[in-house]
Amino acid sequence: MARLADYFVLVAFGPHPRGSGEGQGQILQRFPEKDWEDNPFPQGIELFCQPSGWQLCPERNPPTFFVAVLTDINSERHYCACLTFWEPAEPSQQETTRVEDATEREEEGDEGGQTHLSPTAPAPSAQLFAPKTLVLVSRLDHTEVFRNSLGLIYAIHVEGLNVCLENVIGNLLTCTVPLAGGSQRTISLGAGDRQVIQTPLADSLPVSRCSVALLFRQLGITNVLSLFCAALTEHKVLFLSRSYQRLADACRGLLALLFPLRYSFTYVPILPAQLLEVLSTPTPFIIGVNAAFQAETQELLDVIVADLDGGTVTIPECVHIPPLPEPLQSQTHSVLSMVLDPELELADLAFPPPTTSTSSLKMQDKELRAVFLRLFAQLLQGYRWCLHVVRIHPEPVIRFHKAAFLGQRGLVEDDFLMKVLEGMAFAGFVSERGVPYRPTDLFDELVAHEVARMRADENHPQRVLRHVQELAEQLYKNENPYPAVAMHKVQRPGESSHLRRVPRPFPRLDEGTVQWIVDQAAAKMQGAPPAVKAERRTTVPSGPPMTAILERCSGLHVNSARRLEVVRNCISYVFEGKMLEAKKLLPAVLRALKGRAARRCLAQELHLHVQQNRAVLDHQQFDFVVRMMNCCLQDCTSLDEHGIAAALLPLVTAFCRKLSPGVTQFAYSCVQEHVVWSTPQFWEAMFYGDVQTHIRALYLEPTEDLAPAQEVGEAPSQEDERSALDVASEQRRLWPTLSREKQQELVQKEESTVFSQAIHYANRMSYLLLPLDSSKSRLLRERAGLGDLESASNSLVTNSMAGSVAESYDTESGFEDAETCDVAGAVVRFINRFVDKVCTESGVTSDHLKGLHVMVPDIVQMHIETLEAVQRESRRLPPIQKPKLLRPRLLPGEECVLDGLRVYLLPDGREEGAGGSAGGPALLPAEGAVFLTTYRVIFTGMPTDPLVGEQVVVRSFPVAALTKEKRISVQTPVDQLLQDGLQLRSCTFQLLKMAFDEEVGSDSAELFRKQLHKLRYPPDIRATFAFTLGSAHTPGRPPRVTKDKGPSLRTLSRNLVKNAKKTIGRQHVTRKKYNPPSWEHRGQPPPEDQEDEISVSEELEPSTLTPSSALKPSDRMTMSSLVERACCRDYQRLGLGTLSSSLSRAKSEPFRISPVNRMYAICRSYPGLLIVPQSVQDNALQRVSRCYRQNRFPVVCWRSGRSKAVLLRSGGLHGKGVVGLFKAQNAPSPGQSQADSSSLEQEKYLQAVVSSMPRYADASGRNTLSGFSSAHMGSHGKWGSVRTSGRSSGLGTDVGSRLAGRDALAPPQANGGPPDPGFLRPQRAALYILGDKAQLKGVRSDPLQQWELVPIEVFEARQVKASFKKLLKACVPGCPAAEPSPASFLRSLEDSEWLIQIHKLLQVSVLVVELLDSGSSVLVGLEDGWDITTQVVSLVQLLSDPFYRTLEGFRLLVEKEWLSFGHRFSHRGAHTLAGQSSGFTPVFLQFLDCVHQVHLQFPMEFEFSQFYLKFLGYHHVSRRFRTFLLDSDYERIELGLLYEEKGERRGQVPCRSVWEYVDRLSKRTPVFHNYMYAPEDAEVLRPYSNVSNLKVWDFYTEETLAEGPPYDWELAQGPPEPPEEERSDGGAPQSRRRVVWPCYDSCPRAQPDAISRLLEELQRLETELGQPAERWKDTWDRVKAAQRLEGRPDGRGTPSSLLVSTAPHHRRSLGVYLQEGPVGSTLSLSLDSDQSSGSTTSGSRQAARRSTSTLYSQFQTAESENRSYEGTLYKKGAFMKPWKARWFVLDKTKHQLRYYDHRVDTECKGVIDLAEVEAVAPGTPTMGAPKTVDEKAFFDVKTTRRVYNFCAQDVPSAQQWVDRIQSCLSDA
């Protein structure tokens, strides 16, 4: 029984003591005046009576009632029922308030819905009303009884009833009611009233009335669920409302939802205004505040605000509320909606039932609570299986094994449940409900008996609803045990009674009368026996064992039974000594141990062997067992939620090996490197589990004790069904019946058990925390956890062990003892903290605890001494036999810098090679060594998996390609030990992820890293491999410091420039023009097969030439013999001018070769000779160059042979220049600055470029289409990878907008091609200038339209670099993706934006090609002119000129545009230490990728193969060759790279030029040759450029683990496999089939294409027959010629040959092509694309415009037509080449003169186009001409390009040839 009310208080308005405008509450009377002993009077109650503040009102308000809740220091709640009414204020109160208000002049707002006194509003005579409050204070929550009782007292006062108030209040204070048990009590206060009080059946269940249902109505399902999760996860929750009763109900409802958990933080349903600062508390709370104070809550950053009146919940951004785990979240939501809105289920029915039964509000309230009760039962199902009974007597001590619970439920990663289990509410839940013998309630029954039903009902909503309604009935019955209740009879005041004038204020009560009544009742209570209802205590049922909240079916472990069998077999082999069998199974076991079941199986199997006394192992067995244990532990988290570490803990202290007599090493010394051992929670859970086992054994009968101890989370075994909780329950039941002595004995036994376990665990912890070598600092560095625990467990402790230990190791004192003591001290502190915690919680006496603190240091010290002997003996063990190191194959001249360091090559993020789910053998991890040479980083080794152990794994990359080096800590795949490692990433798309073997010291690893860094970034370019290679074979250049031996390099370069100047002068004086020597690059010898190649140089007369062979040695250092070979050769081929401007023919040439930059005075990054307009003088170029960045002024680099348009390149414009010129609105002033004159010179220069174009020269500067023939407008291009005849080459309406990426009038096609209308506009610019958009912003167009500025947006070098880094990570990821799938690779590839940059480059290039093809010249001047400019102009030339698509032409293109024009290879490749900070920028690689994309779309247009591009991509960063070193020709000359000393090439030396290497290799193998090469004449390529048309280059993704990268040919080509008959085994012939692993084998070698295979076979057969082997090229040429002849006789060749696709006519007539029309994309499938019925009108127009040569190439004619006249003529080769006899064919049909080596040849050596012939005249014999021939037999053919010298066998023949040629010319 308990008092219904403890205190009655009368509180009235009183003035504020500090004189403020507001009043304050004053307690007028309280009863009883003396505090109850068991319940003192709550302080500050007057604040809660008027939460909004005590204020006077101008009118009488109706009475109000609410219940405030106060919490005392013992967490007991006191309910304060407050009934407030208003009485006329006394004059003194009114006057005081008015004076204060007038003084302060503060206007008070309207608060709480009441109108307050304003200082100016009321007249002095106006009546004010003061509040007065009747308060009941009780520890019981009977709101309705309080409302009725206080209402009765108020009614007696207002209505003036003849009832004594003192008697009523006295009866109220003396009324007692039962606490619980479902009893019913009728009470009367002596005023003719009657009230019935019902107590709930179970006091543990909260009473909610309708509060939960109201809360859901106010806020909705989602908001209430958010508040529910917030309260459970300890967030701050604030309710706002204008109603105090609503606030109280909302808080009550939220607490009712939390059952069975009790909220243990600040709980204030109604917070007074004076206490609002409580909201800033750092602890969680649930508080209600009047909505009038909402403004004061705005600044609270971490408070969740629920506005009950507005129905909103506001969650701050900084607050994260973890949601319920799925599927519980969605299930709960759906059930709640069924309860709250039952009509929702029927809304879509065609025939809904006429009526739906809706629950009453009270019943709905219980249904909602039932939903949450089910939710908690599902969340906490099986929690009793994770309780540890630590003590039973004198009081139960229960602990919860959180990790095991989370692991068993499969919710380790769930944030919500983790926070709930860590919260204070759950701690209270365990201590309250974990007790095994206590009264049970509805929740206990639900968890124990209804779990199976809930799981079965999950997918049946109606069954769930039925269960909810059943639970709701029980909850309702608990609150209302007697449904038929007699009605209350209580006097209420009449309506509007508050408005009646009350004759007098509330009277002062007689304290004596009330006290007397209270005393009388107390005396009666003392005499009567206490009516205590006995609690019905029972054993709490545990319920079924827990299951995962969501069954996760993983397909990876479908065959788990087989995996477990493998584990068992392996362990059996180990213990039976079958080590070879065990070794074979070990990799499979280690893979299986990733699964939980296999790890448990391992622990169980090892446990069985320990029980069989088989724990002492030999060395090999010990190593195997330790390795498997380490593998098990490596995936254990610090929580050990699956109990693996717990199961292994007794085993690691059992398995051992004998090192020597008396010295034994246990397994624990080898498994310490795991984080779980340094986690206090793990040790506590282990300790409590073992204590429970021993406590249980203490009380079991001896026969029952035989059963093995149950494992946490497992069901009890059949032998013993009594769990520790059952035993504890039985003992608690018997405890009162035991004698005092027996009780004391049991308490002593339990304490001894706990104490002995504490000693045992102190030993165990020292085993696993002390390292074998206590002087090693690595243990503590890696066990930062030990130190963190010191600071985490006690915030006052600042000297964390990590800090102190690290400090002691950093200071190399040299005292091992001091360091050892530090390790020992750290471990002692860790163990002592553990002992303190567990012993205090387990109730161990202080004496025992002190004894433990004394023992721990001794335990640690003794163990350290034992370990010293173990460590000493373990060092004497013979080392484990490691695999023999495999030596890598080295290049000639490559030397080892660091010999092999043993490492493990680990799998990275690529799936290939790692086996597993990706399939294939597990080539990685591999065990071997890493070698560092002067050229490469090489790993060679063998897989650790013995099933593939015979394969050699090689992974390497050039040192120069290293882009990132990163230290990592990884676990070695064999021993599972944490080791230091390195991750090396290279720009050749290779990754070495290595873990150093334990035998490799940290010093060796650091030395490797430093040496690698030194080789990667040498201080000078001469220290690179390309320079050091072969230096021993060739005499070295004199070093800089030795001046007596020869001039320094700097002197040499000065002499060189000086000699160049002399040579230039001499050439001008003697009117001799510069001519390049024979075709070679930069000091390389002429290839042998190039001597008779046709050369189109523009020499005037052979007699005026200066042969380079006649130059003196000093002159050979001049520019003329060093630099311009590639450039000049190409310029002469293109007909772009001659060196001397004074030659007779030069005046008619539009361009000339200018030597103005011979000394690199104008621009150091340009070549020495440049092409400029004929009319521009050299002295003007200096001024022009000032307008451009880096002085890179516009120079011509290519001219279209058809449209004669030129392509120019330059750097970006400076501010002054064309931009400044066009921006200026006014004419320049008379005193022009130097910049202005430069701008004028620049304008003249551009005008000269425009004037030099034939089609514009006649137009007097006006840009018209006069003279521009329709032939020039015809398309000579090809789209995509299909040849079409139905397209027109269209230019956009606005070229500038198209190049800038804007779609003007014509949108581009879907596949990336430009728009296609045939739209040449009436007037076009002669010159388009492409520049950066930012640079050309706001520039006006040229009014004369001679040139047009085209601003375009291009990427910068830094964007290329950033994109490349992302591409590297996408193609070669360092670690596996979180969700490995093709989509993740494609997503990361897209994020890199690499293909977008390729798309932009191709798009710009194709548009420039169109402009050039239509006759407009283009100047590309982007950035500084050496990166993106180079990419664009190179691509444009490649697409426009078929010559550059040959091996020779591509080499020339790279030499000219990339090397001579100064692309900064060393800067972009970070070749030296100076460039380290800038990093690698793959500009050239990006260009190669673009070429690769074009090659894919036009496979028949390129002479070279895709491998050639990869080869260049690899070696342009490898620094093996000198070709791609340094940033310009100037630097190469300065270093002496462009010449070689006489005699330097004697003997066999390594190739220094990549081109020389390619030439040598091409003679031996067709690897660089494209068999599909079959070009068309004058073909212009227009590739599609959309990202969807682009492919990822396989150079980025392919790998060959068998031999490493295949680009060092000498290394990649291993010895061929012996033929079958030569194999040594003499058994039956084996199959020659073998498995080809794409990531291991080189597929081109393992599966060569048919042509390569046949060529190899041919060479092999020739060798076997003893014949001299024919070169593959000669064989291939003969085969192609034979194929052409096969199709000639009837013109209908059949595809009977292997090479049918190479002949052009076959390719055109037999292929099926896609043909695209100008509108849309029409598909035309035909056998002859030229006679296609789908050809459009525009296609016909275009076909009509074709040049004759293109038309003739499309069909084959009879022999006579093709060969009008033929015979032998002697022809003089190009400059300095001899006369040679050739077979010439005059072809009238094709209007050309072809010549062949021999009459039978089908491949012509050269062609002279008769359209270019200007005259045929008699010639004169020259040096080297045939001696016996008549002088009149010589004649010359003069073309626009050069003069050809011919000699017939006799005079008639010569005359015949002249007549025939003249006849052809006249016929044309």
Curated annotation (Swiss-Prot):
Residues 204-337 form the cDENN domain. The modification Phosphoserine is found at S1121, S1747. Residues 881-969 form the GRAM domain. The modification N6-methyllysine is found at K1223. GO terms for cellular component: cytoplasm; cytosol; endoplasmic reticulum membrane; membrane; neuron projection; nuclear body; perinuclear region of cytoplasm. The modification Phosphothreonine is found at T1138. SUPFAM superfamilies: (Phosphotyrosine protein) phosphatases II, PH domain-like. It comes from the Eukaryota. Residues 7-185 form the uDENN domain. Residues 1762-1866 form the PH domain. Residues 91-123, 1067-1116, 1268-1318, 1606-1631, 1723-1757 are annotated as: Disordered. It is found in: Cytoplasm; Cytoplasm, Perinuclear region; Cell projection, Neuron projection. Residues 339-440 form the dDENN domain. Keywords: Cell projection, Charcot-Marie-Tooth disease, Cytoplasm, Disease variant, Guanine-nucleotide releasing factor, Methylation, Neurodegeneration, Neuropathy, Phosphoprotein. Heterodimer with lipid phosphatase MTMR2. Interacts with SBF2/MTMR13; the interaction seems to be independent of the coiled-coil and PH domain of SBF2/MTMR13 and independent of MTMR2. Interacts with KMT2A/MLL1 (via SET domain). Interacts with SUV39H1. PANTHER family: MYOTUBULARIN-RELATED, MYOTUBULARIN-RELATED PROTEIN 5. The C-terminal domain mediates interaction with MTMR2. Belongs to the protein-tyrosine phosphatase family. Non-receptor class myotubularin subfamily. It is linked to Charcot-Marie-Tooth disease, demyelinating, type 4B3: A recessive demyelinating form of Charcot-Marie-Tooth disease, a disorder of the peripheral nervous system, characterized by progressive weakness and atrophy, initially of the peroneal muscles and later of the distal muscles of the arms. Charcot-Marie-Tooth disease is classified in two main groups on the basis of electrophysiologic properties and histopathology: primary peripheral demyelinating neuropathies (designated CMT1 when they are dominantly inherited) and primary peripheral axonal neuropathies (CMT2). Acts as an adapter for the phosphatase MTMR2 to regulate MTMR2 catalytic activity and subcellular location. Promotes the exchange of GDP to GTP, converting inactive GDP-bound Rab proteins into their active GTP-bound form. May function as a guanine nucleotide exchange factor (GEF) activating RAB28. Acts as a suppressor of autophagy in neurons. Together with its binding partner, the phosphatase MTMR2, plays a role in dephosphorylation of phosphoinositides critical for autophagy initiation and autophagosome maturation. This is Myotubularin-related protein 5. It comes from Homo sapiens (Human).
